Each structure stands twice: as structure tokens, then as C-alpha cells.
Amino acid sequence: MKKKKEKEKEKQKSINYYIFFFQYTLVYNTIQINKIYKLFYHVFITKKKNYFSKSNYNSPPKSVFSSGRENVYLPEEYKKKIEKENQENLEILENSMKDASHSKTTSLPFSSSSPQSSSSSSSSSSSSNSSLSCSLIFSSTLSLIKSELIKDDTIKYSESDSKSDSEFDSESNSDFDSESESEYEYEYEYESKSNSEQPIINNYLDHTYIYNFAIVVKAIHYLHHFIKEMLKFV
């Protein structure tokens, strides 16, 4: 009886550890991918004016690359709300880490597993707890990912960047004839005006198929590893 209980305890410890490992690594890699996405966005998307002016409009239309986010900003109240939610989620992760390090038999805060009542139902309860943990792990993970993605939802530009862009545009536009130059200025003014009137954009994945693909690949990789480790205890 004691040996069975000890084995069940060891199983629960390992299950709790792998649940925490899966959630933590998925969130961490999501944050890293988000940073790479911001760099990609800033280098390739925000510099579209320079590319179009050099190529003399022999390129796809601007609407394909328009993000609609150049003049969009988040209010302070919304930022505080996101930071608060993010802090709460990080506290959940820290508490989970402490539980795993102290080797407690209780489940993680987001696993909602019940304690084992008797030795006869120990195996069935442990399997049900693991399945509940597997199914409910995604809700807290997705909330953490969402808070990280929306925490800094806009790309902020420094004055020096905007100045250099305008200087480059003025130099490159000198190569155009007067008609194409006036057309370019009119279209850019209209686009910036329409962007400033747009509401706050919370969907961070508006036109980034690369970002979506990277998230899916990472999620599948860690989910496969997580399931493979969990099957050892079944």
C-alpha cells in the first residue's frame, strides 16, 4: 500500500513538473517570437515608403503592406489593465514553480485536480487528473500569451526615425516627375489621415502569416514533447 502511494505521489510530481515545463517554455518562446516579429515589422514594413520611392511604384500596391497602425496608440488605462493581468499571470507561474520545486503532491493552480481519496481509486483519479491538466492547461497558457502580445501592441517610432524617413522621402521623390510626386504625397496624406481615425487595433496578427506559422510550429513541437512525456505515466 505504501509503495503504491509513493509511486502515485512520484507520478503526480512528475506530471506537475511537465505541465509547468510545457506552459513556461511555450510562453517564453512566444515572447521571443513576438520580439523577432516586432523587429521584422519595423525593418520591412515601416520602411515601405523608401522602397516604393526607389522603385518608382514598380511594386505591389501600398494597401498590401499597409498595417493601419502607424498613428494608432493605446491609452494609459488600457496599458495599466494589460500590465495588471500580465502580473497576475506571472504570479501564477511563480507559484507553480515553487510548488514544483518543493515537490508538493497537489496540482498546479490551473490544473484543478482533486486529491486521491483511497488506494483503490488512486490510479483512476491520477489518470483523470492528468487528463484534466492536459485540457485545462491551454486556457491559462493562452491568457499569458494574449497578455504578452497585447501588452505592447503598437510600434513606437522615435523622432529621429521619422525625421530620417521624411528626409529620405524628400530626396528620393526628387527623381519623380511633378505629377507622380503630387500623386504620392496625396496618397500618403490620405493614408495617414485614415490611419489616425481608426480605432484601437487589438488584433496583433493582422497580416503576419510568418508569425502565425512560427507560433503553430512552436506549439506543436512543445505539445508533442509534452504528450510524449505524459504517456510515460499512463
Swiss-Prot record:
Residues 102-130, 159-185 are annotated as: Disordered. Its main location: membrane. Residues 103-130 have a biased composition (Low complexity). One of its GO terms (cellular component) is membrane. It comes from the Eukaryota. It is a single-pass membrane protein. The chain crosses the membrane at residues 13-32. Keywords: Membrane, Transmembrane, Transmembrane helix. Coiled coil: none annotated. It is found in: Membrane. Residues 167-185 have a biased composition (Acidic residues). The keyword ATP-binding does not apply. This is Putative uncharacterized transmembrane protein DDB_G0281883. It comes from Dictyostelium discoideum.
